[in-house]
Amino acid sequence: QEATVKPGVEQVLAAMHARGVRMCVASGTETPLIEAALTSHGLMRWFEFAVDCKNPDGKKKPDVYLDALHRFGVQNPVQATVFEDSPVGIATARAAGFATVGIYDEPMAEFWPQITQTADFASRTWQDWLQNVQQTGPAPRK
């Protein structure tokens, strides 16, 4: 299946990069596939690395998020934010201590009400999230 780039993603990545935010991709998809998709769309340049779930439970366990955090040399999840489109990923990341941003994705539409209730901040579009942060700063944690 061909990966598509959501509108506003590159603008958000560029803005975060300009602010010195270090970024990676932590995914349930295997790393070579992640890197190939990001490279084909010119997005890998914004990320320091990609990491996939090694745990058979996937994102039901925080291993992929903690692995990414530790690769940055950071130990405390409070110092990082996880962007997710799945309620399982959001719940797991929050339980591990990460700030969370829920981003709407059409294949996960049925879970949107749950995502908006669970994430620290939820946005239907990447542009809306960026505009909110630029106007008000990061959203407080729930």
Model-predicted segments: where are they?
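Short secondary-structure boundary micro-motifs
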Residues: 20, 25-26, 40, 106
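Asp-based, Mg2+/Mn2+-dependent phosphohydrolase catalytic module
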Residues: 14, 31, 35-142
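Short, acidic loop-to-helix structural element flanking the phosphoryl-transfer center
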Residues: 1-25, 31, 35
